[in-house]
């Protein structure tokens, strides 16, 4: 006797595919925006340190100042997203990305005058940071507005795939552009990408505005601060790899440092694709605890690596671990505010990763000056373990009655 097992209804399967397609069509703008961030990522520290002749602290600051600008722009970005809509925020962000490319072109033109070149570069990084504050959060808000709040974790996960995938692709692409065409090609590519993103966003239908009480930003910030602190501690590992992996490999006499950024991004994306639904099944705090533990192991591998291939494995493990930290804490944070304040909540929560990455450059550069480049990964590991301890505390608090 045989039993017929009914197949999954085509309508349900089609609905799932439709949700994913709608999300991907919006997080495409995050991919474009972060590609403009990834392209100069592996080149700028060496350019500032070797070509312009500045120290490791300034080399780190050139990367970190972008995140500081994003941090300062978050309140404004949240108001734009909630008040004018995510589409308008994406358009503003793409225009800013294109403008940042122009300042990078100026920096290359002034290469013979190091101070002027550095100043142009810093202004461009500030503009790019402000643009990032608009595009990243707006794409999440646009996606949630299109597919509904029950798919929040999925939207955040796909947005992360787009952002770190773009960084993983952009870093080696930037190196190749400089090798083939020269430094100017990075600025030109960023201008073109910003214009492309603007042109693609212009004809798309906007998400409906959610009406309701608008909480003051500092109230929203207060609600999401514990979750944001966990994210910030986990992000130090990524910031350390992104800013100093090229200088760390050079200090050890190793080649192919850019592969670490690609390994980090590739494993980050793989974990997001494989385990994104785990947040809905297990809860954000449980996922954050596991992920921060894995990230800590990866950073320990980088600290103790005897050769570049072990270092590469450490970067890959760090990317795998960090992959779900943002959505794991993020889902718990966004649930603390009304839907009409979703943009502000995303902006306030994301502010902590900006703060972390903004501080990481000069702080880790200072640690490197005192103890050598190898020590920075032990420092990042201790930060990730602190984030793990915070996630455990938040999880225990969430289970208390009342």
Curated annotation (Swiss-Prot):
CDD domains: MFS_YfcJ_like
Species this protein is from: Pseudomonas paraeruginosa (strain DSM 24068 / PA7) (Pseudomonas aeruginosa (strain PA7))
One Pfam family of this chain: MFS_1
Record membrane topology: Multi-pass membrane protein
GO molecular function, one term: transmembrane transporter activity
Subcellular location: Cell inner membrane
SUPFAM superfamilies named in the record: MFS general substrate transporter
Main location: membrane
InterPro entries the record matches: MFS, MFS_dom, MFS_trans_sf, MFS_Transporters, MFS_YhhS-like
Domain of life: Bacteria
Family listed: Belongs to the major facilitator superfamily. YhhS family.
UniProt entry keywords in alphabetical sequence: Cell inner membrane, Cell membrane, Membrane, Transmembrane, Transmembrane helix, Transport
GO cellular component entries: plasma membrane
Protein name (Swiss-Prot/TrEMBL): Uncharacterized MFS-type transporter PSPA7_3302
Gene3D superfamilies associated with the record: MFS general substrate transporter like domains (1.20.1250.20)
Entry's transmembrane regions: 23-43, 52-72, 90-110, 121-141, 158-178, 180-200, 228-248, 255-275, 282-302, 309-329, 351-371, 375-395
């Amino acid at each position: 006797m045989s039993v017929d097992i009914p197949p999954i209804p085509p309508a349900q399967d089609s609905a799932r595919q439709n949700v994913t397609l709608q999300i991907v069509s919006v997080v495409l703008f995050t991919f474009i925006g972060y590609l403009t961030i990834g392209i100069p990522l592996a080149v700028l520290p060496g350019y500032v340190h070797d070509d312009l002749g500045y120290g490791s602290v300034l080399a780190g600051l050139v990367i970190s100042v972008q995140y500081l600008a994003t941090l300062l722009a978050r309140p404004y970005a949240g108001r734009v997203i909630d008040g004018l809509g995510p589409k308008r925020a994406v358009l503003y962000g793409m225009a800013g990305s294109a403008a940042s490319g122009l300042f990078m072109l100026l920096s290359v033109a002034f290469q013979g005058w190091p101070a002027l070149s550095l100043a142009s570069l810093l202004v461009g990084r500030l503009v790019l940071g402000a643009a990032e504050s608009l595009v990243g959060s707006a794409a999440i808000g646009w996606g949630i507005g299109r597919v509904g709040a029950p798919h929040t974790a999925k939207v955040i996960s796909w947005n992360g795939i787009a952002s770190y995938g773009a960084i993983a692709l952009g870093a080696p692409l930037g190196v190749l552009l400089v090798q083939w065409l020269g430094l100017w090609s990075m600025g030109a590519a960023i201008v073109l990408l910003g214009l492309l993103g603007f042109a693609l966003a212009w004809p798309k239908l906007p998400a409906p505005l959610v009406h309701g009480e608008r909480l003051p930003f500092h109230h929203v910030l207060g609600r999401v601060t514990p979750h944001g602190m966990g994210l910030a501690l986990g992000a130090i590992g990524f910031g350390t790899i992104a800013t100093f992996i090229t200088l760390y490999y050079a200090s050890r006499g190793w080649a192919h440092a850019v592969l670490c950024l690609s390994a980090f991004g590739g494993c980050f994306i793989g974990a997001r694709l494989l385990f994104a639904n785990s947040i809905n099944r297990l809860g954000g705090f449980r996922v954050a605890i596991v992920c921060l533990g894995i990230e800590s192991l990866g950073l320990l591998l980088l600290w103790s690596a005897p050769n570049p291939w072990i270092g590469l494995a450490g970067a890959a493990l760090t990317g795998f671990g960090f992959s779900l930290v943002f959505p794991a804490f993020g889902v718990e944070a966004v649930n603390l505010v009304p839907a009409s304040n979703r943009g502000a909540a995303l902006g306030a929560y994301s502010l902590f990763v900006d703060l972390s990455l903004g501080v990481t450059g000069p702080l880790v550069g200072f640690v490197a000056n005192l103890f050598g480049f190898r020590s920075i990964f032990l420092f990042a590991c201790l930060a990730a373990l602190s984030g793990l301890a915070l996630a455990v505390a938040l999880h225990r608090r969430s289970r208390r009655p009342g």
